[in-house]
Amino acid sequence: MNKLLIIDGLNLVRRIHAVLPDENDIASVQERVLAASKKMLLQHQPTHCMVVWDGNEPSWRKTLYSDYKKGRKPMPTALSDGLVNIKATLAEHDINSFDAQSEADDVIATIAMKMISNKGEVIIVSTDKGFSQLPTKNLTLWDHFNQQVFDVEQYEKKLGIEQYQMLDFIALAGDSGNKIPGIMGIGPKSAADLLNKFRTLANLYRSLDNLGAKQALKLAEGKEIARISYKLAQLQCDIPLNINLKQFRINPITN
């Protein structure tokens, strides 16, 4: 069975960079990213590995909702300029990169789902909880920084929902980290309570007459922003990609 390790490039690099005392010390970032990548290869023993990077084109999500990810700290210039050397260092060790046109998340989701549909296994290395919406069969979410599998079931219990309700939950409650708005006045607890009772967003909107007047009004007035929030949170798993998996094949790692 083919086993693909997909590393969310900027997620890894920016977190490594953030803990360094000198933000201009890109050589240390380079060394640590390579060491981390080698460690993952040794741990997971994949047949293929790729590092997926965000591109520079504007995200379609930003076009849909201009405040998407608003206020997020820009990448330091030294790090941005150093990415080309980081990619080159990885490539020297047969860890090849794939550059997305815009956000890496949709590319990662597309590649992962295609691999799984072809009876392969996938490990996604990222701390981005958005990947928890993907089907879990033959898919592992690996948190390199905590050295553990991201437990989707535990995350669902924490939110008080089931996996299939994840996008409906964000449509209602939003996602502050990505500046996805959700419906004003509907917080995580209310969203979970509503989904526990009505199961899906569609069924909830068919049942507004069964709610109190105040809550029903909030939901009615927020229907369009809920639709937008759902779309913003939803990973695209069908992006056309010109990619040959053979270029990402790696030799077995022994040390």
Curated annotation (Swiss-Prot):
UniProt feature coiled coil, ranges: none
EC identifiers of the protein: 3.1.-.-
GO BP term (any one): DNA replication, Okazaki fragment processing
Textual note on the cofactor: Binds 2 Mg(2+) per subunit. Only one magnesium ion has a direct interaction with the protein, the other interactions are indirect.
UniProt: K(+) binding residues: 172-173, 181, 183, 186
UniProt GO molecular function: 5'-3' exonuclease activity; 5'-flap endonuclease activity; DNA binding; magnesium ion binding; potassium ion binding
Record keywords, A-Z: DNA-binding, Endonuclease, Hydrolase, Magnesium, Metal-binding, Nuclease, Potassium
Cofactor: Mg(2+); K(+)
Cited CDD domains: H3TH_53EXO, PIN_53EXO
Name of the top EC class for this enzyme: hydrolase
Family of the protein in this entry: Belongs to the Xni family.
Function description: Has flap endonuclease activity. During DNA replication, flap endonucleases cleave the 5'-overhanging flap structure that is generated by displacement synthesis when DNA polymerase encounters the 5'-end of a downstream Okazaki fragment.
Protein name, per record: Flap endonuclease Xni
Gene name linked to the record: xni
